[in-house]
Design a protein with these regions (language model features):
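A composition-driven surface/loop motif
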Residues: 12-16, 27-218
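Bacterial Sec-dependent N-terminal signal peptides
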Residues: 1-17
């Protein structure tokens, strides 16, 4: 009888441990990691069915931005990348001149990136690129959360779009959308299956003197 009690107790402990592990796993999956572009330029690569991010503290010196655990953000696998330029102390969105490069390597690869209240302003004479470069032969999806500003100041020797998708960088596609609420939850769909209602993501993109506004749906 005592053996049966011990077995039942052991099973209960094991079941509880398994439940805690499942809850922990679900909680981890629910929150997408945020990367502050103000801390360093970002390179995102989607290849062979996976997506990774590298963030440079100083690319010329080969140094990386570190996360809260002190680990380098270097080719880190992440399927739900969220980019911000928020000051973590004040919560204020700050402008940065750091750049973002997103590469969906091959035709069947897809990069999924969320812009969440980013403010990126780049001088092309210094950056030699646009603020956000889209490259590769695959598909890139940009989700808009909150108010986003992406601008370039063009030098006549270095002219680039704020969000640049050029054939010389690959034949892939770029889709800018607003399918999620600002908290990352899916929006309701209308009769045509398009996102409707909820929070509306916004994007101001263009040159300093000639800007074009692109609003999210809903």
């Amino acid at each position: 009888m005592r053996k049966n009690v011990k077995k039942q107790l052991a099973l209960r402990v094991l079941s509880t441990a398994a439940l805690v592990a499942m809850v922990s796993s679900i909680a981890t999956a629910a929150f997408a990691a945020e990367y502050n572009v103000a801390e360093g330029s970002v390179e995102i690569v989607a290849k062979d069915g996976s997506q990774s991010i590298t963030q440079w503290a100083d690319k010329d010196k080969g140094t990386f931005v570190k996360d809260e655990n002190g680990d380098n953000i270097d080719h880190r696998p992440d399927s739900k990348i969220v980019l911000v330029t928020k000051d973590e102390t004040t919560g204020e969105t700050k402008p940065t001149s750091n750049t973002v490069t997103i590469t969906a390597e091959n035709e069947n690869d897809t990069a999924n990136v969320t812009l969440k209240n980013v403010d990126i302003r780049v001088d092309t004479a210094e950056a030699k690129s646009g603020a956000i470069e889209i490259k590769g032969d695959g598909n890139t999806n940009l989700e808009l959360n909150g108010d986003n500003t992406v601008l370039v100041k063009n030098d006549w020797k270095e002219e680039h779009a704020a969000i640049e998708k050029a054939d010389k960088y690959g034949k892939g596609t770029l889709t800018i959308k607003d399918d999620l609420n600002d908290d990352g939850t899916p929006k309701d769909k209308d009769e045509n299956g398009n996102a409707a209602g909820g929070d509306t993501g916004k994007l101001l993109a263009g040159g300093f003197h000639q800007a074009a506004a692109i609003g999210g749906g809903g």
